[in-house]
Amino acid sequence: MGQKVNPVGLRLGINRTWDSRWFANKGEYGKLLHEDIKIREMLFKQLKQAAVSKVVIERPHKKCRVTIYSGRPGVVIGKKGADIDKLRKKVSEMTSSEVFINIVEIRKPEIDARLVAESIAQQLERRVAFRRAMKRAVQSAMRLGAEGIRINCSGRLGGAEIARLEWYREGRVPLHTLRADVDYGTATAFTTYGTCGVKVWVFKGEILEHDPMAQDKRQAEQEAGPSSRPQRRERGDRERGDRGDRDRGHRA
């Protein structure tokens, strides 16, 4: 099932947390949930050129704190903070709570799955060869510290008459391992031949803080050191022992 399910949803509560962090009574839950959906749709639409990866919404008492994770924070803030004031006014019109907006810069957008998927989708819309776009994204991610990446592109690639799926993978992407930090993102390219879907999985390493067995194993390896491990001898250096007094002649 790890191959089919959304890797982010599978790991919620294990090594990932929710993008909406608030509690509401039964009567208000639906209203606040729809507010979150509308706020996210508006922000992703308004900040299409700002490389927004995700929007986290928190609701303390009678307040609404919106945190925008962006690869280009300068585009979000605008000149002297003018654009962020406009965003705050628009969000205030959608909710009755007092609105606060925070901007967090994404240091390595090349290993953010959503931003990688959107970048490939934009290149497909500009008629860049899909293989070149996928290979370039894979190389950039591996160069900047990703332990593995997989990219799927599906649709009428290159204007072909029959839709197909093309994929590239480099490194390791363990989808069944729950302690693995796997980021997942999707995007859609609207081309003249139709839509093309892009899916990206990025493996950033294993999170071992909450796994006591993994911590004990790692600590034991560090204490033992590399020299205490038994070394395997080469095939030519093996000593052949005495094979005994076995009779090699013909049996009577």
Swiss-Prot record:
Keyword Chloroplast: no
Residue intervals of the KH type-2 domain: 39-107
Keywords per UniProt: Ribonucleoprotein, Ribosomal protein, RNA-binding, rRNA-binding
GO biological process: translation
Matching SMART domains: KH
CC per GO annotation: cytosolic small ribosomal subunit
Family designation: Belongs to the universal ribosomal protein uS3 family.
Protein name: Small ribosomal subunit protein uS3
Origin species: Xanthobacter autotrophicus (strain ATCC BAA-1158 / Py2)
Species classification: Bacteria, Pseudomonadati, Pseudomonadota, Alphaproteobacteria, Hyphomicrobiales
Underlying gene: rpsC
